[in-house]
């Protein structure tokens, strides 16, 4: 019986959130606004109305759409230019889990065109199956829709989610899936998670091996 490990992307496997903070500051500067990375840190792990409100408060509602487009394009430019953004141990962990016989899936709120660039840059295009992005659902995390859809694409075998934010943990739990949290930027431990690995993603294979009930 092949168990599936479903990964979030940003902040869990890749440090694009750090790239985004830099791009956010740059976008604000283009608008003539002095903002710091700390100002934009509340955006990490946010989505939907809460994200929109944070952006509107920081750069103005009239500039919100442009701000998001500029920031995303700047991040993609950094990635295409060879920015080092894979989190330490992520690639090794994926290889180890694959060798252990786990099926690897991806569930991210990011748009498909963005995910395609990230996966091409990391060499992970064929690493995950299935892959679900924000372009495949109508509601983003913390809404559990993406994980409900993921469950329909997986055989009736055990599955566990790996997330880095409270928003992601809530989405997985809302779909009835166990979730391991590896806290990301500005994220304290979420004790609603099945487990919290505060040290590193490289601890995940051993944790899974020691907890066969979940995967």
Swiss-Prot record:
CDD domains from the UniProt entry: HAD_BPGM-like
Xref: SUPFAM superfamilies: HAD-like
GO molecular function: phosphoglycolate phosphatase activity
GO cellular component: cytosol
Name of the protein this chain belongs to: Uncharacterized protein in fgs 3'region
Top-level taxonomy: Bacteria, Bacillati, Bacillota, Bacilli, Lactobacillales
GO biological process, one term: DNA repair
Family: Belongs to the HAD-like hydrolase superfamily. CbbY/CbbZ/Gph/YieH family.
């Amino acid at each position: 019986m092949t168990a599936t490990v479903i990964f979030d992307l940003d902040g869990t496997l890749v440090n694009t959130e750090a790239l985004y903070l830099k791009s956010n500051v740059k976008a604000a500067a283009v608008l003539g606004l002095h903002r710091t990375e700390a100002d934009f840190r509340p955006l990490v792990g946010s989505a939907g109305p809460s994200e929109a409100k944070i952006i509107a408060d920081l750069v103005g509602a009239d500039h919100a759409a442009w701000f998001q487009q500029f920031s995303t394009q700047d991040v993609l430019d950094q990635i295409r230019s060879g920015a080092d953004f894979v989190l330490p141990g992520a690639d090794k962990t994926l290889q180890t889990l694959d060798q252990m016989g786990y099926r690897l899936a991806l569930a991210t709120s990011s748009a498909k065109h963005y995910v395609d660039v990230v996966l091409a840059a990391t060499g992970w295009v064929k690493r995950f199956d299935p892959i679900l992005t924000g372009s495949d659902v109508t509601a983003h995390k913390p809404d559990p829709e993406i994980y409900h859809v993921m469950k329909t694409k997986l055989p009736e075998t055990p599955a566990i989610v790996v997330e880095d934010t409270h928003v992601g943990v809530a989405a997985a739990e809302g779909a009835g899936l166990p979730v391991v949290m590896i806290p990301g930027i500005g994220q304290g431990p979420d004790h609603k998670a099945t487990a919290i690995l505060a040290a590193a993603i490289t601890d995940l294979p051993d944790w899974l091996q020691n907890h066969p009930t979940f995967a």
